[in-house]
Amino acid sequence: MAFKLSKRSLKRLEGVHPQLVDTVKIALSKYAIYDFGVTCGVRDMATQKKLMASGASKTLRSKHLIQDDGYSHAVDLVCYDGGVRWEMPYYISTAEAMRSAAREVGLSLTWGACWHVKDYCAADDDCDDLMDDYIALRRSQNRSAFLDGPHWQARF
């Protein structure tokens, strides 16, 4: 089934790097098993500071902020299946769609559920295996894993 971004999601992609926008659109229309939308593209510093203070973000150097090229390099997605879904299997499925689309566009991505893999698109491992590897790595460092399955950021 081919899905299409809503007007609200398209509005949230304004100011996001065109290659990342293309990747999101292709992922949804060509590869996605589940419908998804965009919850965040460009973010201002005031919002970023609030998210960091609440623990929802780990940095003030977010790729959601406008970068030197004038674009945001990050998006957050939300999956739908009879309503909003936050369970990780939905985001693992979306991760496969995003990887396929990014390869088609020629974009390097980092996924928020496997931060240790800087070029997620170059990895051939299953998405859930990459996520498990990230969790194991963080445990071996006596640190907690920051799993942000909805988050995607481009690497330029």
PLM region descriptions:
Residues 1-37:
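Active-site acidic/histidine clusters and adjacent loop/turn architecture
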Residues 25-56:
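Extended, low-complexity, intrinsically disordered C-terminal regulatory tails
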Residues 15-17, 52-57, 130-134:
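A short linear-motif detector with a strong N-terminal bias
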Residues 55-65:
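Cytochrome P450 catalytic domain signature, combining two hallmark sequence patches
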Residues 65-156:
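Catalytic cores and adjacent binding grooves of peptidoglycan-active enzymes
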Residues 18, 22, 46, 72, ...:
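Short, well-structured alpha-helical interface segments that form or flank functional binding sites
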